[in-house]
Each structure stands twice: as C-alpha cells, then as structure tokens.
C-alpha cells in the first residue's frame, strides 16, 4: 500500500498494491461462520466460568482469581467479535466508523496480552504451589493475586495503545472500499518493526519461555518425588496435562505470531510479491480463529482440571443454585496446603493429585 496525501471527509485515502490479496469467497463465508461459533461458545463457556468461580466457589484461591480474570478478558474480546464477523462477511468493508475501529482493534490486542500474561502468572503460581508449597505460602495470597491481576490489566492496556493510536479507517481508492487497518508510511520503518517485535517477544516469546520453564520444573519435581516415594503410584495424567498445556499454548499462537510479523514486512514494502501477500492475508484470519478460539476455551480447559470446578459447573447446568453446603469443604481445601516443612518432596507428589484445583 502507498499512502496518498488526500484526506477528504477526514478519511485518509490509500492505494492497495495487491488489491486481490486475501479476497476469496470462501474466506468471506468461512471466517464469519467461525467467528460466530467462537462468539457463541466463548460467551456461553466464559460466562459459566465467571458464575461458577465467583458465585459457587466464592473466589477463595489464587488460581481462581487468575481464571476469573482470564474469563473476563475473553468476554471483553468476544463482545467485539460480531463486528469483525460483519466486516469479513462484507468483504472487508468497515461500516462502523473510526471509533469502533479503534475500540475493536484495541480489544483484540488487549485480549492477547491479558490472556498470555494471566496464563504465565498461572504457570508460576502452579510452580510455587507444587514445588515450593511451604516457602510460597506467604507470597501466594489473595491480595497478591488481585494486585497482580490489576497490574496485568494495566500492562495489557498499555500494550494495546498502539491499536488505539495507529489503527484507523482508510479508503482504498483502487478498490473503492473502506477498511479498518494499520497503515504505516514507508519512510517510517522503526514504528511498525518495533510494534511487530513487541507483539512477538512480549506477547509470545517471553511468556512461552516462562510457561515452558515453570512446567518443566514441575515435571522434574514430580518425577523426583515419585522416585523418592516408591510406594506412591505415578500419575501419568499429570505429565500428559503438562505436555498438553505447553503444546496447546505453543501451537495456538505460533502461526498468528509468524503471519503478524510477515504482515508488518508487507506493510513496510519489504515484501512486495503479491502472491506472498495473498498467502499472508488469506492465512491471517485463519490463524486468528485458531489463536482466539483456543484462548476462549482456556478458562474451561484449566477449570475442568479441578474436581470441584467440574462439580459446581454441572450443578450450574442443572440449575442448582449455590448453597452454604457448597462451601462447607473448607477443611478439605486447607488440607491441600498443610504440608510438613521436612516433607517437601512428598508434598509435591501429593499435590499432583490436585494439580489444577482452583477451589
């Protein structure tokens, strides 16, 4: 694309060097359909997660705080998804004005950072709870968890500011359509490269390394605990869960991160081949569907690793309201934290039985 100086009606006019890139009839049908499915499943699932954690489980643990915020971040994003579905169904014609363009774009960016940061904190919390249960008890408090979530929301908001500032409505003169897009002037290459690298590094590389390290250390601690506790049967499900969590995160986000960076190179004119631009523009919405569908399933995925979460979730589906009896098991909850200081490795093996309990 080449920026033009014309700004009639307050909308900048640009030329699209590859006007047919990513414009395929199957994309205009398939992607809105997938967005609609993600919207329905995500709103339903994440709303139930919020109700279960807040009203049934009463938000009593660190893990539940992170999961609640994860579900809320997903709901904020999902509310803007119908706009993107309409936008794609209308063959990338944006009818909602510049303000909604910025808000919807910021919501997508915010969800990316908030979800990734929360999953990273959740992995650190699991590491501390399982590997260092005694040492971390004073640090793993509800106050610390809530303050951490506030910081995460602020950081995600700051990381989303470029979408508010630089995402705008543009009129493409050679195709006569109005789009909601990032557009960079070719002479200013520092900004888009900086934003692209920030998204790649801050939104994926660093979090993935922390998540990988946390669960690897958990894996090693549990293996060591099982060797010491020879009479304790090894729970292979825990190791499968760890592997699934790491791979789930990696393969959900890698495609989107790769094509995001390629898109920056196209915007800068470093990649000028329209065939490559077509591949990138066609694949981009598909990678978005993969990343954000998995993102919206995360609260359910992590929640269902806890037995009591599944119990309350099924109660909710059966329209059984939360009662005082639902929270009578406080001694059971506290027992998972009552370890003898001299029995740290033994407690790791015991703790693996409730690897992701959020109650």
Swiss-Prot record:
Residues bearing carbohydrate: 4, 176, 188
Membrane topology listed for this record: Multi-pass membrane protein
Protein name, as recorded: Type-1 angiotensin II receptor B
Cytoplasmic topological intervals: 56-61, 126-141, 217-239, 305-359
Function per UniProt: Receptor for angiotensin II, a vasoconstricting peptide, which acts as a key regulator of blood pressure and sodium retention by the kidney. The activated receptor in turn couples to G-alpha proteins G(q) (GNAQ, GNA11, GNA14 or GNA15) and thus activates phospholipase C and increases the cytosolic Ca(2+) concentrations, which in turn triggers cellular responses such as stimulation of protein kinase C.
Keywords of the record: Cell membrane, Disulfide bond, G-protein coupled receptor, Glycoprotein, Membrane, Phosphoprotein, Receptor, Transducer, Transmembrane, Transmembrane helix
PANTHER family per UniProt: CELL ADHESION MOLECULE, TYPE-1 ANGIOTENSIN II RECEPTOR A
Cell compartment(s), UniProt: Cell membrane
Residue spans crossing the bilayer: 26-55, 62-89, 99-125, 142-165, 191-216, 240-268, 279-304
Disulfide feature: 18-274, 101-180
Tissue: Is expressed in the liver, kidney, aorta, lung, uterus, ovary, spleen, heart, and vascular smooth muscle cell. Expressed most abundantly in the adrenal gland.
GO BP term (any one): kidney development
Organism: Rattus norvegicus
Post-translational modification (record): C-terminal Ser or Thr residues may be phosphorylated.
SUPFAM superfamilies in alphabetical order: Family A G protein-coupled receptor-like (SSF81321)
Listed PROSITE patterns: G_PROTEIN_RECEP_F1_1, G_PROTEIN_RECEP_F1_2
UniProt KW Transmembrane helix keyword: yes
GO CC field: plasma membrane
Gene Ontology molecular function: any one: angiotensin type II receptor activity
The organism's place on the tree of life at top rank: Eukaryota
Compositional bias per record (Low complexity), positions renumbered to this chain: 346-359
Assembly and interaction partners: Interacts with MAS1. Interacts with ARRB1. Interacts with FLNA (via filamin repeat 21); increases PKA-mediated phosphorylation of FLNA.
Region called Disordered, residue ranges: 339-359
Amino-acid positions noted as binding angiotensin II in the UniProt annotation, renumbered to this chain: 15, 17, 167, 182-184, 199
One Pfam family from the record: 7tm_1
